[in-house]
UniProtKB/Swiss-Prot annotation:
Protein name per its UniProtKB record: Alpha-1,6-mannosyl-glycoprotein 2-beta-N-acetylglucosaminyltransferase
Species lineage: Eukaryota, Metazoa, Chordata, Craniata, Vertebrata
GO molecular function: alpha-1,6-mannosylglycoprotein 2-beta-N-acetylglucosaminyltransferase activity; carbohydrate binding; manganese ion binding; protein homodimerization activity
All ranges on the Cytoplasmic side of the membrane: 1-9
Leading EC class: transferase
Entry-linked InterPro entries: GlcNAc_II, Nucleotide-diphossugar_trans
Residues with attached carbohydrate: 64, 81
Keywords: Disulfide bond, Glycoprotein, Glycosyltransferase, Golgi apparatus, Manganese, Membrane, Metal-binding, Signal-anchor, Transferase, Transmembrane, Transmembrane helix
Residues the record lists as binding substrate: 118-122, 149, 224-228, 293
Membrane topology: Single-pass type II membrane protein
Disulfide bond residue pairs: 191-205, 278-281, 329-352, 334-435, 373-381
Native source species: Rattus norvegicus (Rat)
GO BP terms: oligosaccharide biosynthetic process; protein N-linked glycosylation; protein N-linked glycosylation via asparagine
Length: 442
């Protein structure tokens, strides 16, 4: 039997099949993207703290001790679908960088100050910070970037309530929440914190070779903050699109800070004073932890001091030049055995930066630490009590706020400050390498 082939019919049939395939593919692609980016669905399901593990265990020989006995090996954890969807969502949001509360014509650009707030999971304090921002004069001119290491419906709702200034949310892509059962989270194959190194080598846990200076193994909950801070520093200066040609300052805050209503007014005058009378000042700080009761006689005064991590880590403002000098110290920052980002910076001022930092700081603080609980505290959180005390101080001194001019009150001798004894918690080579990698990330 002879078959007759009609080229026109074959061509038409081919085009019809291709069109049907494209429609099916594109509809599935849109559905997958919509599913991945739907906050209500993600927020309605709690993210589990660990993946699912197989019931049986294998046997492996310790690689660094040929004479060691065979030990059970914990299998590599599986990653549940919800965790993968969170990772996908974070990647997409960091790529899209959707600005809110700005004109949609594409002509908006940031002013002379950008705020970057490091946010974990303390919404009660974040609410106070947002309230203080809402009361700040001139805040409509300021871009506020919230950098998160925890996805939360409550926190996202709080950020959505910010309608008084431009807002951008970015997300630390290597958080414990996104890697709950593997590094940089807590891998079940990791060594227990207090296990001795010899015992760890015999056990064969994966980081047995890398305890910290005090013989302890890493704890992810402590490592994360330093990781987040360094990633955020690089990301906002190098990867936030709207800041690519930015020449102003970036003010770094944390979720438990509280700002005075004249902080921006004072900041602009500090910046002008720095340019005119202290060109050698490297950084600006909005205040210290010193308790004061009255702004009388000091509200218009700033001091020039040697930067000290335990005093000047709140409201730290950096220029691009200061950032570029810092980022050149990546290896030193990422290998220094202290899980505190600020104490590590103190070490950099001695070991890597061209000189010790000179800071310009107001005698009457325009920033306050509302968080009396958290990583370094064991107290019960009392945000309402703290905020009431701060508000009382500001109300009692409102006649001294918004000074017309600023003057340098005192210039202290510049001298290197020895960093406090390092705290450890940062001996794991995996932390070192991940930290270094942020500079290479696109």
């Amino acid at each position: 039997m002879r078959f007759r082939i009609y080229k026109r019919k074959v061509l038409i049939l081919t085009l019809v099949v291709a069109a049907c395939g494209f429609v099916l593919w594109s509809s599935n692609g849109r559905q997958r993207k919509n599913d991945a980016l739907a906050p209500p669905l993600l927020d309605s399901e709690p993210l589990r703290g660990a993946g699912h593990f197989a019931a049986s265990v294998g046997i492996r020989r310790v690689s660094n001790d040929s004479a060691a006995p065979l030990v059970p090996a914990v299998p590599r954890p599986e990653v549940d679908n919800l965790t993968l969807r969170y990772r996908s969502l974070v990647y997409q949001l960091n790529f899209d960088q959707m600005l809110r509360n700005v004109d949609k014509d594409g002509t908006w650009s940031p002013g002379e100050l950008v705020l970057v707030v490091q946010v974990h999971n303390r919404p009660e304090y974040l609410r106070l910070l947002i309230d203080s921002l809402r009361k700040a004069q001139g805040i409509r001119e300021v871009l506020v970037i919230f950098s998160h290491d925890f996805w939360s419906a409550e926190i996202n709702s709080l950020i959505s309530s910010v309608d008084f200034c431009p807002v951008l949310q970015v997300f630390f892509p290597f958080s414990i929440q996104l890697y709950p059962s593997e590094f940089p989270g807590s891998d079940p194959r990791d060594c227990p914190r207090d296990l001795k190194k010899n015992a760890a080598l015999k056990l064969g846990c994966i980081n047995a070779e890398y305890p910290d200076s005090f013989g302890h193994y890493r704890e992810a909950k402590f490592s994360q903050t330093k990781h987040h801070w360094w990633w955020k520093l690089h990301f906002v200066w190098e990867r936030v699109k709207v800041l690519q040609d930015y020449t102003g300052l970036i003010l770094f805050l944390e979720e438990d800070h509280y700002l005075a209503p004249d902080f921006y007014h004072v900041f602009k005058k500090m910046w002008k004073l720095k340019q005119q009378e202290c060109p050698g000042c490297d950084v600006l700080s909005l205040g210290t932890y010193t308790t004061i009761r009255s702004f009388y006689g000091i509200a218009d005064k700033v001091d020039v001091k040697t930067w000290k991590s335990t005093e000047h880590n709140m409201g730290l403002a950096l220029t691009r030049d200061a950032y570029q000098k810092l980022i050149e110290c990546t290896d030193t920052f990422c290998t220094y055995d202290d899980y505190n980002w600020d104490w590590t910076l103190q070490y950099l001022t001695l070991a890597c930066l061209p000189k010790v930092w000179k800071v310009l700081v107001p005698q009457a603080p325009r920033i306050f630490h509302a968080g009396d609980c958290g990583m370094h505290h064991k107290k019960t959180c009392r945000p309402s009590t703290q905020s009431a005390q701060i508000e009382s101080l500001l109300n009692n001194n409102k006649q001294y706020l918004f000074p017309e001019t600023l003057v340098i009150g005192e210039k202290f001798p510049m001298a290197a400050i020895s960093p406090p004894r390092k705290n450890g918690g940062w001996g794991d080579i995996r932390d070192h390498e991940l930290c270094k990698s942020y500079r290479r990330l696109q």
